[in-house]
Amino acid sequence: MPEVIAPPLIPVGKIKSFGAFGPKYEVGRALRQLEDGDWLVEVKMVETGETAEYRMTHLFDDPEAR
């Protein structure tokens, strides 16, 4: 039987930016765990509505948007 892994706590709904001056994005749900233990999280670009997958470790390094 496959092991069930609970996704980490993700700040869903928070608005963050890619680095200090990058575009803003809204944090979505955890999608899947990667082989290195990191997680992919769905993010939605505030300006365009486009969605993308983003590593959780990068998400926690990004500042909250101003």
Task: Describe these PLM feature segments.
Residues 1-14:
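Mixed-charge, Lys/Arg-rich low-complexity intrinsically disordered regions
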Residues 45-66:
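Intrinsically disordered, low-complexity, charged/polar segments
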Residues 21-24, 48-50:
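Short acidic/polar mixed-charge low-complexity motifs
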Residues 11-19, 43:
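A short beta-strand micro-motif
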